[in-house]
């Protein structure tokens, strides 16, 4: 998290990061928030990828491929309020059409250049409880990246970045179909999508 406008926290953050580097620990590390008694600041170096907002607009969810999960950030204060472990290389986030849950594409690698047949998966997270309710593994391994939910909500389509594949997940059962495509499909857009105006990237419309 970026709290660099607050000098009183810098020394503690720097110390925590240095200790994490010495120990080689990749786990989440927290220090007390000097501005908010009882709250903590995450100091673990990471690489945020995708960002989505809750249906009520109160909370941001940020996938982080270096810490294998999703940061939960309050939309009013911009402070982290939680963390949801999902899977290795958490990358893309896609809300379900009913607005009750969201899907997290775990790319199966913490590296920019991964390898085929990694431990890729999709985590289903409940918006209300902020807990993982299901995990859909990919038989034989895979690397789900970016994509879209179909307009009727029945399928989650994702590019398989390191496997030259596109995945289609059944959102009821988690069953996955694979389509071989060209090299390193990063993202894809399923059409049509609800909305009129494109906000960029893979099918973000409003």
Predicted stretch roles:
Residues 1-206:
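Predominantly soluble domains enriched in secretory-pathway, periplasmic, or organellar proteins
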């Amino acid at each position: 998290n970026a709290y660099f406008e607050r000098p009183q926290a810098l020394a503690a953050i720097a110390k925590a990061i240095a200790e994490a580097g010495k120990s080689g620990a990749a786990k989440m590390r927290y220090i007390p928030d000097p501005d908010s008694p009882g709250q903590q600041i995450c100091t673990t170096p990471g690489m945020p990828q995708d960002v989505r907002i809750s249906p009520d607009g109160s909370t941001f969810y940020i996938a982080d491929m270096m810490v294998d999960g999703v940061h939960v950030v309050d939309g009013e204060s911009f402070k982290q309020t939680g963390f949801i472990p999902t899977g290795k290389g958490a990358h893309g986030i896609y809300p379900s059409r009913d607005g009750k849950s969201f899907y997290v594409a775990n790319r199966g690698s913490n590296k920019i250049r991964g390898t085929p047949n990694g431990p890729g998966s999709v985590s289903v997270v409940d918006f209300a409880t902020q807990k993982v309710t299901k995990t859909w593994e990919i038989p034989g391994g895979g690397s789900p990246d970016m994509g879209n939910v179909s307009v009727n909500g029945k399928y989650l389509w994702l590019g398989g970045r390191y496997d030259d594949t596109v995945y289609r997940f059944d959102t009821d059962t988690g069953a996955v179909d694979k389509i071989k495509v060209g090299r390193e499909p990063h993202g894809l857009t399923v059409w049509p999508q609800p909305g009129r105006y494109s906000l960029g990237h893979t099918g973000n419309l409003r």
